[in-house]
């Protein structure tokens, strides 16, 4: 009788240990699947560019093509970087149109700036469809890197359905001449209720993917930038830039500057 009880106890102990091992194995598999899902989300991230407006005459310019001197010295380099001033925005390959959408009243515009504040300063210009311009001046950082220029909340907000043209010019401090410039277009879109509901329930990584899949570039880039700031191991920033051919800038540091000051 005692032997039977011992056998039952042994059987129960083995069953209990087996259950624990299966539970741990299952948990490990789920964790691995979640990890793979996050990695797959970034690797398969797709930016679905909206149809380009048919009535734009000048396509814009995403990157500065050449190098211009400062203060009359055409051979003086302003930076040791080999990269040029570049707007971190999509460009349509067939038309070379620089155009992207936002849902924000006051979006942020991101640029790679290879110049330092020792030599140069910046000017950001926003022009509406009636060609009314708002001109902002900004200082630059002390070193090359990615800068974010956010429209100040005291300015007139972007209107839904309206298209705006923007210019970002870099001036030489010595002679106040433009040494580099980029330009493009932005249109503010209405955020539909279905997407808004999805975004409210989404994780930070999923928000990047949702914005990108719906062609909302500026918010996708801002969400990816925030992930990069809070988690240096996250790959959303690099993956998003790669979708529009800007992977060369994925590892460039973000530099803290710059405030836009209205000149009007």
Write out the residue ranges for each language-model feature.
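Bacterial N-terminal signal peptides that target proteins for export
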Residues: 2-16
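C-terminal segment of classical bacterial N-terminal signal peptides
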Residues: 19-29
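Extended, polar beta-sheet/loop recognition surfaces of beta-rich domains
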Residues: 41-57, 61-71, 76, 94, ...
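Contiguous beta-strand segments within globular domains
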Residues: 96-112, 117
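Extracytoplasmic/surface-exposed domains of secreted proteins
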Residues: 109-111, 146-174, 178-180, 184
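Solvent-exposed loop/turn segments flanking beta-strands in beta-repeat/beta-sandwich domains
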Residues: 114-124, 128-130
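Solvent-exposed serine/threonine-rich low-complexity stretches and specific carbohydrate-binding patches
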Residues: 133-145
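Preference for solvent-exposed, low-hydrophobicity sequence contexts
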Residues: 236-264
């Amino acid at each position: 009788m005692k032997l039977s009880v011992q056998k039952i106890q042994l059987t129960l102990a083995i069953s209990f240990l087996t259950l624990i091992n299966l539970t741990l194995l299952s948990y490990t598999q789920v964790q691995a699947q979640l990890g793979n899902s996050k990695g797959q989300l970034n690797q398969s991230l797709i930016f679905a560019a909206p149809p380009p407006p048919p009535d734009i005459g000048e396509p814009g310019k995403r990157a500065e093509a050449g190098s211009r001197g400062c203060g009359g010295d055409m051979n003086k380099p302003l930076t040791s970087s080999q990269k040029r001033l570049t707007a971190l925005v999509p460009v349509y390959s067939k038309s070379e149109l620089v155009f992207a959408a936002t849902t924000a009243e006051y979006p942020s515009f991101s640029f790679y700036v290879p110049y330092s504040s020792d030599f140069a300063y910046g000017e950001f210009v926003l022009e509406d469809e009636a060609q009314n311009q708002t001109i902002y001046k900004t200082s630059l950082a002390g070193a090359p890197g990615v800068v974010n220029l956010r429209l100040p909340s005291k300015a007139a907000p972007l209107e839904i359905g309206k298209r705006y043209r923007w210019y970002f010019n870099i001036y030489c401090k010595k002679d106040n001449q433009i040494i580099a410039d980029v330009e493009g277009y932005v249109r503010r879109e209405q955020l539909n209720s279905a997407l808004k509901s999805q975004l409210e329930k989404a994780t930070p990584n999923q928000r990047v993917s949702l914005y990108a899949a719906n062609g909302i570039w500026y918010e996708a880039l801002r969400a990816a930038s925030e992930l990069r700031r809070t988690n240096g191991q996250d790959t959303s920033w690099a993956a998003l830039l790669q979708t529009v051919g800007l992977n060369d800038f994925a590892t460039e540091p973000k530099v803290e500057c710059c405030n836009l000051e209205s000149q009007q």
